[in-house]
């Protein structure tokens, strides 16, 4: 009997024993190639010596000091490092323990910004359908993942949603990429006008939609137009880079590849690379200064925020990314991964789309390529692919509800940045085998 309240009450899970590089090993000695980083977390693999050394050094000095009494060298260094890789108007970092906490903090920061600025009537959030921003109540309320939201709708704060920027499903055949980008982005303006600009606080979006829709990148010009709309109506832009940030997309921040800068950006997952739970909100000077010059106190906080050991792990993670030139590695290996996936999978009748940026790749499954009709829910494609992949020694991240929270299936890949070409060969080979085996059950 297990005394752990598992995610699934009836799950029988292998017991993890150790990790080495891109591999995990269970207690039975079975080896798994980690092609998803758990959930886009393990950017440096599972046994990086520099990160472990930094954590041990911090533990030997002091493991914990409450931020109501002290700051720490590791938190000060981490905030400085993050800001060094941000545009110049970003100079303050709020450190928390994970992605949901980061999003919750950003939502409250946006609200307090407008209260301190003399606009307390601004209280509405707008986000996108098929988005995911966390499982705590505020983050769940702005998120557009219907399956996750459904049981808790009666207790969620009302938020508003527009269509996602999802070219594979919604770009029309006669539209150019830019035309589609503008049409999708202009939904935000329409929603702001519907609600009244004086009531709208912020727009929340993932630069690359993560697990809910499967590494869906924005089309060219989309976020440029979003930024223009936010500026026009005095709406803050909150970008959620919890999954796609910290180098995952091929740049340290995914928004660097867009023609827009946020007011607040959320980070987590890869920030600590799985060695410690940590998250952050980076605020621009406009938001920070309004609070600093107003009450001077952000009315928020968590016990373990800016945890010294977690910050030490994150410092070592960021330093490793740049010292080892891992952004170059991400871009090189992502090109190889996309090429091999296309070669092995693109012609299969149930592969609809292979997309993403950097080492953040989504594979959308369909019943029919031409119509893009989804697989039937009865196939249980996501669950069967995950199970079979594990049996084949591969960890990937399949999900259902890709299109609307109910229909559609995809597989998310987010391997460690240290992945090598022979690992990619193994990944694609095992994934191809898994898909072909599971597809036999769909007939």
Residue ranges and their predicted role:
Residues 1-443:
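Conserved N-terminal phosphate-binding loop of PLP-dependent enzymes in the Aspartate aminotransferase
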């Amino acid at each position: 009997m297990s005394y752990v309240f598992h995610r699934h009450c009836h799950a029988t899970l292998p017991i993890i024993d150790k990790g080495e590089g891109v591999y995990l090993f269970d207690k039975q000695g079975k080896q798994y190639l980690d092609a998803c980083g758990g959930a886009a977390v393990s950017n440096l693999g599972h046994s990086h010596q520099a990160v472990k050394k930094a954590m041990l050094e911090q533990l030997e000095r002091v493991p914990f000091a409450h931020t109501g009494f002290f700051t720490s060298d590791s938190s000060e260094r981490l905030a400085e490092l993050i800001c060094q890789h941000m545009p110049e108007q970003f100079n303050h970092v709020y450190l928390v323990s994970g992605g949901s906490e980061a999003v919750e903090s950003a939502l409250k920061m946006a609200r307090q910004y407008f209260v301190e600025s003399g606009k307390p009537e601004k209280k509405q959030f707008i986000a996108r359908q098929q988005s995911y921003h966390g499982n705590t109540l505020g983050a769940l309320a702005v998120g557009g993942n219907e399956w996750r939201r459904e049981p808790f709708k009666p207790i969620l704060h009302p938020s508003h949603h527009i269509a996602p920027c999802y070219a594979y499903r919604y770009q029309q055949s006669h539209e150019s990429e830019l035309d589609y980008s503008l049409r999708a982005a202009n939904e935000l303006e329409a929603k702001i006008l519907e609600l009244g600009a004086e009531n709208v606080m912020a727009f929340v979006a993932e630069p690359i939609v993560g697990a809910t829709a499967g590494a869906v990148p924005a089309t060219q010009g989309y976020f440029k137009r979003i930024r223009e709309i936010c500026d026009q109506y005095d709406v803050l832009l909150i970008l959620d880079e919890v999954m796609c940030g910290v180098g995952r997309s091929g740049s340290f921040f995914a928004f660097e590849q867009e023609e827009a800068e946020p007011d607040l950006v959320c980070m987590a997952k890869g920030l600590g690379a799985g060695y410690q739970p940590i998250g952050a909100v980076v605020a621009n000077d406009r938001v920070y200064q309004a609070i600093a010059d107003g009450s001077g106190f952000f009315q928020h906080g968590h016990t373990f925020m800016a945890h010294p050991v977690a910050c030490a792990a994150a410092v070592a993670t960021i330093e490793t990314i740049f010292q080892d030139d891992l952004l170059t590695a991400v871009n090189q290996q992502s090109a190889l991964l996309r090429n091999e996936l296309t070669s092995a999978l693109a012609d299969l009748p149930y592969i609809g789309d292979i997309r993403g940026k950097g080492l953040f790749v989504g594979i959308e499954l369909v019943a029919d390529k031409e119509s893009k009709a989804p697989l039937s829910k009865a196939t249980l494609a996501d669950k069967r692919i995950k199970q079979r992949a594990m049996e084949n020694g591969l960890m990937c991240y399949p999900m259902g509800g890709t299109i609307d929270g109910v229909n559609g299936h995809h597989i998310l890949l987010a391997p460690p940045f240290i992945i090598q070409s022979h690992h990619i060969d193994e990944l694609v080979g095992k994934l191809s085998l898994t898909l072909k085996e599971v597809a036999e059950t769909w007939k």
